[in-house]
Amino acid sequence: MDARQPVRQLGPVVIDIENITKDYVMGEEIVRALRGVSLQIRRNEYLAVMGPSGSGKSTLMNMLGCLDTPTSGRYEFNGRNVAEMDDDELAAIRNREIGFVFQTFNLLPRATSLRNVELPLIYAGMDPETRMERATQALTDVGLGDRIQHKPNELSGGQRQRVAIARALVNNPSIILADEPTGNLDSKTGEEIMALLEDLYQRNHTIILVTHERDIAAHARRTIRLRDGVVESDESTFVPQLETVAAS
Amino acid sequence: MKRFLYELEESWRIAYAQMRSNMTRSILTALGVVIGIVAVTLMGTAIGGIQVGFDKSMAVLGDDVLYVTQWPWKAVDDWWNYRDRKKIQTEYAETINRIIAATPNSNLVVAVPTSSLMRSIKYGGNEVENVFTLGTTSDFTVTSTIDCKEGRFFNEIESRSGAQVVVIGYDVADVLFPSESPIDKSVLISGHLFKVIGVNARQGTFLGLFSWDSMVAMPLAAFNKYFNLKNQLDVPGQNQGESDVRVKVKDKTKLAEAKDELTGIMRRARGLLPEKKEDFSINEQQAFKSTLDPVKNTIAIAGLFITGLSLFVGAIGIMNITFVSVKERTKEIGTRKALGARRRTILLQFLIESTALCLLGGFIGLTVAYFMCFGIGKAFPSFPIQFSFGLVIASMIVSVLTGLMSGFAPAWSASRLDPVTALRYE
């Protein structure tokens, strides 16, 4: 906690949220999941969003991932107003700007690693040759160059999450949004995945990590804590060991 | 556009993988469509067969021949106005031919008299009863296409001299001469000997419509000598024979003019005063067709409707299984949406899945129907079955449409899923 300094120069603002709220109607009741959250995320940040269940963490993640739109407030993604986009425009943003990594991997069970990684490229309308090339490259980048024809059930949990990360990377998105990426993995494999994310961060990717585990969040350079739908704290963190590793 | 093609390709791939991994389910569901397509295809084949059989029978009448008859070829309510009309005499044919010859630029070619009765025919120990026995002239071959399998039709000399020769139909020959050639054999018709000079090629019977297969033809002079129609007509309870005159038209596009000309000639032949109404009818194939067409069309529509119902049941099966598929793969839909699939993409994916199932069913159904048609054709050679390429295309289109329609509701609901809810679905 003594050396609070950014690891490197931060880029331009990617996500700019101002005072967003989200209300859900649950039967008769209105649940106010977010009660005015403001947040700026810049390129090349490594950010963790923390909070107990019910804190609005998942709701905020859905907003950040453009899976949902806020009830009120301003949300700009790379300067574009996302809050008022329709379904298909949001789909386009998700396709190009956001790489999702899920707790449960969410791979298509009957498709090979290659086909899974190709999927965002298909939705982007890319031709088969480029698709193949880029998907292979992404899989190689996460250390699965020799597993491209394997189906998810032929891979270990860690390998599956690597495929999912390759899929998140392949369209070269502005942010990688990882929701409890180690939640379904044992701690050793979890560390490997965190090391991979660290590696991606070092290669200039922007990472948003949603977690409730303190030691997972500790990998990030900045931590936001949510409680009852508002930001409780927003602080930069510094992990000396990792810096040492990165520097060497 | 390109993107649409890639999405389309992807959808086909998913559909294929989906069918393979749920083999039993897919086949059972497709079975509904298979049965529907078989039913509809067989019905279509049957309707095509009816059409062909009908056309074949109509061809016997000829589309360029006018028939002068006592009764019109249509249902009449005021039958009493026709009952007492003078009979059509075969002699009118000579009158008409004389006038045709004297008229320059006549629209008519030749008039052929025919008289017919039902008679029994014997050869050795074999006998055929109630054979349509026709007396006519050698010009008959002008008005009707007669293919002789063996021998020939009688010629003008035999016709004029009233030679005791006969041309017999395929079925008649089959019964009387099961193991030998009928040519130059003598058959007994009502106790009189006739020499067989020709056998007609098989025409096929259809729905009891007229066919050459069960008739015999002889020169009119011989017919009149032995089966005097004038006497027959007066004896109650006897086989009612009848005579008519058929007239070949030069140009079938000028049928109406030819009809007017023939009407004039017939009025002269009958000596009708200008103010008198015609006491004869002039018919053509078309009149016959227009009475039968509504019947045929009703059969076709009712048949297709009823068999269409079975296809509809198949379509409901497809719809059901697509709903199940959407439900099962809600999380996958959520993932796809998170990765950038738009509503249209998801819609397309499930539409193609249901269409692929229907196409599979349609293809199997067509194959089954084809072999069934083949079997029916072998078992009942007289039924003119018609399995056409058009039918294949039509049933494939029907399959695709069925798939699209039955898949639409589930696919639509899938495309409308909220990504957050879908992702959370377990």
Residue ranges and their predicted role:
Chain A
Residues 1-23, 233-248:
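ABC-family P-loop ATPase nucleotide-binding domain
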Residues 10-226, 231:
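ABC family nucleotide-binding domain
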